[in-house]
Amino acid sequence: MGAIKASCPGSCGELFQCVVDGEEFLMSYGIEKKSQVVIGPQTGVMEEGLRPKMLQVINELTDQIDFDYTFQTDISVGKGYSSSTADMLSILGACSAYKHGTVSVPLLTSLCSKIEPSDSVGFSDWTVMNPLNGAIQWQTRWKPKLYVYILEPDQMVDTTSFIRMTDSPLYPAEQSKTLLTDFKIACDKQNVELLGSVATRSALLNNKRLPKPYLNDIIDLVNKLGLLGVNIAHSGSIVGILLTEEQLMHMTELEERLSHHPLASYYSLRNLSKIIYDGLQVKKVEEILE
């Protein structure tokens, strides 16, 4: 069989995360950063070795790595970009297609969750899932045209080391239940304003468990400029400012205000990304070259 290429986007944290009846749920959206794996009998010089979690998860699918591979990524680690999930899904997707000829995103996501709590970046539709087992709670086909201005600090964190929402006495789990309900309403009504509100509320609730520096200042600025909302990496360090396409006209003023605020030295890396709906993409290399 010829070579197979698989890629999976990272995310800027989660649009929202909540606890319902003692069970954790989250929804991640894709951004223009990705992990990519090519496997086959001959793929050329290996550019980068597989990361430890990729090697761990591949053992859930096969007991023999009898193929060559290349691995590339532009997703930062230890920030909340879903880098591990994107890495694992890329190698799983490529291996599954190469060895078995089929790819099941729900199955592969559940395999990732055996290694560590995972995100829903593998799905091309927005998907609410349990990060601990990959079980799907709800999906929507709505694909609003949105952007995110990502605020990234220099420091890295171990995103798996934080206490879970369900175990944290600081997290207001009961209040968070409405996030899931309101997210469903926002999607059914295609209401981007309610969507932004869900994201911001989720960020504020999580701030009681894992405070983000300057979060309230960022939200105040977003409200002053009339932007959509703020979302965060609930177990990471990055923050996202959500914008509609029409609100991109405020980007110059937004960056100017951010750059003159003390938060600029903390969130020193700032970049704009389109929110994408690619999910896990798997193709034969010949199809890519045609």
Task: Please place each PLM-identified region on the residue numbering.
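Short, flexible, solvent-exposed loop/turn segments with mixed acidic/basic and small polar residues
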Residues: 36-38, 227-233
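Solvent-exposed alpha-helices and their adjacent loops that cap or buttress functional pockets
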Residues: 6-8, 19, 29-31, 119-122, ...
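DPxDG-like acidic metal-binding loop motif
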Residues: 79-105, 121
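Small/polar glycine-rich anion-binding or flexible loop at a beta-alpha turn
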Residues: 233-240
